[in-house]
Protein backbone atom coordinates (compact mmCIF):
# COMPACT_ATOMS: atom_id res chain seq x y z
CA UNK A 1 0.00 0.00 0.00
CA UNK A 2 1.38 3.40 -0.98
CA UNK A 3 1.54 5.98 1.76
CA UNK A 4 -0.90 8.86 1.41
CA UNK A 5 0.73 12.17 2.28
CA UNK A 6 -0.61 15.72 2.55
CA UNK A 7 1.88 18.56 2.01
CA UNK A 8 0.61 22.06 2.72
CA UNK A 9 2.16 24.86 0.69
CA UNK A 10 3.24 22.29 -1.87
CA UNK A 11 3.32 24.41 -5.03
CA UNK A 12 6.64 26.17 -4.43
CA UNK A 13 9.90 26.08 -2.52
CA UNK A 14 10.44 23.50 0.20
CA UNK A 15 6.88 22.18 -0.09
CA UNK A 16 7.21 21.56 -3.82
CA UNK A 17 10.54 19.79 -3.39
CA UNK A 18 9.13 17.73 -0.52
CA UNK A 19 6.15 16.71 -2.66
CA UNK A 20 8.47 15.73 -5.52
CA UNK A 21 10.74 13.68 -3.25
CA UNK A 22 7.81 11.85 -1.66
CA UNK A 23 6.26 11.14 -5.07
CA UNK A 24 9.58 9.68 -6.25
CA UNK A 25 9.51 7.39 -3.20
CA UNK A 26 6.14 6.04 -4.30
CA UNK A 27 3.83 8.05 -2.05
CA UNK A 28 0.44 9.37 -3.18
CA UNK A 29 0.97 13.05 -2.43
CA UNK A 30 -1.78 15.64 -2.11
CA UNK A 31 -0.78 19.26 -1.82
CA UNK A 32 -2.96 21.96 -0.35
CA UNK A 33 -2.39 25.54 -1.48
CA UNK A 34 -4.25 28.75 -2.28
CA UNK A 35 -3.24 28.58 -5.93
CA UNK A 36 -5.82 27.69 -8.54
CA UNK A 37 -3.52 25.16 -10.20
CA UNK A 38 -0.94 22.78 -8.83
CA UNK A 39 2.23 21.29 -10.27
CA UNK A 40 3.21 17.90 -11.64
CA UNK A 41 4.64 16.95 -8.23
CA UNK A 42 1.36 16.11 -6.48
CA UNK A 43 -2.41 15.97 -6.66
CA UNK A 44 -3.53 19.55 -6.13
CA UNK A 45 -6.41 20.51 -3.85
CA UNK A 46 -7.11 24.21 -3.52
CA UNK A 47 -7.27 25.00 0.19
CA UNK A 48 -6.18 28.07 2.12
CA UNK A 49 -4.89 27.01 5.55
CA UNK A 50 -6.35 30.20 7.05
CA UNK A 51 -9.86 28.95 6.19
CA UNK A 52 -11.02 26.16 8.48
CA UNK A 53 -13.86 25.07 6.18
CA UNK A 54 -11.55 24.82 3.13
CA UNK A 55 -9.09 22.74 5.17
CA UNK A 56 -11.84 20.42 6.42
CA UNK A 57 -13.22 19.94 2.91
CA UNK A 58 -9.76 19.24 1.49
CA UNK A 59 -9.06 16.60 4.15
CA UNK A 60 -12.47 15.02 3.49
CA UNK A 61 -11.67 14.92 -0.24
CA UNK A 62 -8.40 13.06 0.40
CA UNK A 63 -10.20 10.62 2.69
CA UNK A 64 -12.97 10.07 0.12
CA UNK A 65 -10.38 9.25 -2.56
CA UNK A 66 -7.93 7.24 -0.47
CA UNK A 67 -9.69 6.07 2.69
CA UNK A 68 -6.79 7.06 4.91
CA UNK A 69 -4.00 9.60 5.44
CA UNK A 70 -0.59 8.37 6.55
CA UNK A 71 1.51 11.53 6.93
CA UNK A 72 0.94 15.29 7.05
CA UNK A 73 3.75 17.73 6.24
CA UNK A 74 2.78 21.18 7.54
CA UNK A 75 4.81 23.40 5.25
CA UNK A 76 2.53 26.35 4.37
CA UNK A 77 4.01 29.61 5.56
CA UNK A 78 5.91 32.75 4.73
CA UNK A 79 8.53 35.00 6.26
CA UNK A 80 8.78 38.67 7.07
CA UNK A 81 12.20 40.28 7.08
CA UNK A 82 13.38 43.52 8.57
CA UNK A 83 13.55 45.23 11.91
CA UNK A 84 10.60 44.67 14.22
CA UNK A 85 9.98 48.39 14.61
CA UNK A 86 9.20 48.56 10.88
CA UNK A 87 7.07 45.42 10.75
CA UNK A 88 3.42 46.04 10.00
CA UNK A 89 1.31 44.58 12.82
CA UNK A 90 -1.41 43.32 10.48
CA UNK A 91 1.18 41.55 8.30
CA UNK A 92 2.68 39.95 11.42
CA UNK A 93 -0.80 38.76 12.48
CA UNK A 94 -1.34 37.30 9.00
CA UNK A 95 2.00 35.52 9.22
CA UNK A 96 1.03 33.99 12.56
CA UNK A 97 -2.36 32.98 11.15
CA UNK A 98 -0.74 31.17 8.21
CA UNK A 99 2.40 29.78 9.84
CA UNK A 100 1.00 28.71 13.22
CA UNK A 101 -2.78 28.57 13.12
CA UNK A 102 -2.70 27.08 9.61
CA UNK A 103 -0.81 24.11 11.03
CA UNK A 104 -3.29 23.91 13.91
CA UNK A 105 -6.26 23.87 11.50
CA UNK A 106 -4.75 21.14 9.33
CA UNK A 107 -3.80 18.99 12.31
CA UNK A 108 -7.23 19.40 13.91
CA UNK A 109 -8.83 18.20 10.67
CA UNK A 110 -6.47 15.24 10.15
CA UNK A 111 -5.47 13.94 13.58
CA UNK A 112 -8.87 12.48 14.58
CA UNK A 113 -8.69 10.24 11.49
CA UNK A 114 -5.11 9.27 12.26
CA UNK A 115 -6.05 8.41 15.85
CA UNK A 116 -8.83 6.12 14.58
CA UNK A 117 -6.32 4.50 12.18
CA UNK A 118 -3.87 4.04 15.04
CA UNK A 119 -1.00 5.67 13.16
CA UNK A 120 0.14 8.70 11.19
CA UNK A 121 2.74 11.35 11.99
CA UNK A 122 2.31 15.08 11.55
CA UNK A 123 5.48 16.98 10.64
Task: Enumerate the predicted regions with their spans.
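Conserved glycine-rich cofactor-binding loop
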Residues: 11-12
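Conserved glycine-rich Rossmann-like NAD(P)H-binding loop of the short-chain dehydrogenase/reductase
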Residues: 20, 25-40
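Substrate-binding pocket helix/loop in short-chain dehydrogenase/reductase
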Residues: 83-84, 91-93
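The beta1-alpha1 cofactor-binding region of Rossmann-like NAD(H)/NADP(H)-dependent oxidoreductases
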Residues: 47-57, 89
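Hydrophobic positions on the long internal alpha-helix
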Residues: 73, 106-110
Amino acid sequence: MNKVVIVTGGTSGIGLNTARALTKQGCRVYEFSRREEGTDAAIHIRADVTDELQVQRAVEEVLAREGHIDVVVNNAGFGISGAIEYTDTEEAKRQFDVNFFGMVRVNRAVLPHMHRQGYGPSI
